[in-house]
């Protein structure tokens, strides 16, 4: 063991050990530097309990004796400067534990990694200046109120949205471990970040989404984990190219006015041998107690969120993604698994904290700190929790007892509504509460209504195929359901494929069923979603008061016998509202009365049953005049045709009082002139 005192390194490491170094990516890992006139790379790795650490790679024929690292015992950090190292060199740390076990570990702070099944880190400088052209977007985001603006998210898995045609995929007849990195890329079928961007961005703009949410891009060994079992938190996966490619993608999306959100997994990590597990022979990143470190549900290891160093590692990673890659938001995965000791682990029972509860106190404090730091460093980021329980105040600040996120997925709404839509309409009248219950709590948090990737895998069927009924009914139900979803309070998220009516479940290893668009029903559902997205963006009443009861009012929630609901969505202007009527059965209704708070004309501006959407074209044409007839305790009403399995949207046509006054004045003037003659 070679000792070295790195004095200039001391303050950074003191902050690291105190959980307040949130820019660790500048301190640890590999950085291209110049020392004493020599250009090369400096490597630093935290392995406080190791007996010896050596740097190995192609540059020394993987012979670590040539590059034994120096140990700073006070901070537990090993370091070495190697001249003439350039970008593209592969490396690992050869770590000998105090039990004389030898591990070859990837760099936890590596900015780039080999494509699987390769596991080495690659020297890459992602902190060097990049020609960003998104100042306009970043400045706009700084002034943007996320609660009073449209958020309509398209969730994407980059490896399966589009893939290379079979004709362009090279098949190489030798074992994977014998293939070069280029050969692995050539036969993977993946598009690179630039190719994906150049196809995905025009599509997102065409369809009218406001944001994309990308499933995890941190480096991971197994395609089938979808990125949720990571080993390289600072390394954008090499499946789709290099870090500059991802910067290009973000830059282009921002220039076009589209936000970029990343899925992020702060609770657990992959247990592959080259990763974080027992990094220096001891549980460094995971909990020391097996009952806490083992995540038996996913076969992963839980991060030790009580550790100051692990907190610094993870919070620095979140900051890194905003700082280096200019992302706009993070969706924290599996927050319920983080905040509860026993969540999702039925074989584990009786785990209690020091107060006798099942809350993970240290993990909760970590989440509060994470959000506090991100919000203090970046203007108006989206910090979204995937949290599936009734834990209170998830989207409230830590200073009032909250976790500090600004949005969470509304898992209750999703579960209730998918259960309802899978049900035979004959029986829906007995389960009407599944439609109405969400309005009892939907303003208790800031919600995103999510129909995510999790709902279209593992035998659950696609969103379209979940819909009850025959072929025609499934499409009608999907249109109705999405229309209802866009009327319900909360921002929106849909997983790729829903917008084209994909019948098959999502498969991570092949692209979406784009071929289905040659069939009219699928093409028309795409048009429907595009038009619905455009309406959502245009109408302030659908997003300006999303988190308050001021933006919603029931017209009729009690017609369970016919499974019809009606409600109003309002903007801050009391005369700017939309009236929604949703029919959850295949029975049409004619001359159906719907209550109106105002004695005002209406116009139908959207109807999921239009023939251009492959519907039956039961419409409400022209001006719909009100009646002086009470309905559901509301003084006025309008008479409508309600198509089967439909959502219709109506807008009031208030008279322009200023224009009316001017018209009256003109008439008076003309009358006076005629009289004087």
What are the language-model segments listed below?
Residues 46-53, 597-600:
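Short proline/glycine-enriched turn/loop motifs at strand-loop junctions of beta-rich domains
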Residues 326-328, 346-509, 516, 537-609, ...:
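Conserved alpha/beta catalytic core and glycan-binding cleft of carbohydrate-active enzymes
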